[in-house]
């Protein structure tokens, strides 16, 4: 298993994972599946030189999950805040992969002053 920075060619697999959650769970609030074009635009926000980063986990060329940090809210009071997300393919659940993705993501974004705070609702 490899964890690496997300690449443009990962967008189709990421879209498939997102769409599973849209279509089969209440984890996302979208009612219509994402398009490849929509996710390509979404992908453009990530860079390994900013606090907005994307990591993917692959095994034997198959993308099993991803974790990312994104803008939290588009208001200046939250400029120093990021929202972090992890999604896994169904066959990758329960194997510690989400924790490994989060560990890599948190390690990388700390260099940009991001700290981890947990909010429970």
Predicted regions and their residues:
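Glycine-rich phosphate-binding loop
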Residues: 92, 96
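Conserved GNAT-fold acetyl-CoA-binding loop/helix
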Residues: 15, 19-43
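Conserved small/polar residues in nucleotide/adenosyl-binding loops
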Residues: 117-121
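Conserved beta-strand positions that form and line the central face of beta-propeller blades
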Residues: 2-5, 28, 56
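A short beta-loop-alpha structural element at the N-terminal edge
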Residues: 2-14
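Acetyl-CoA-dependent GNAT
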Residues: 8, 33-91, 102-103, 107-108, ...
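Short, solvent-exposed beta-strand edge segments and adjacent coil->beta transition regions
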Residues: 1, 26, 81-83, 114-116
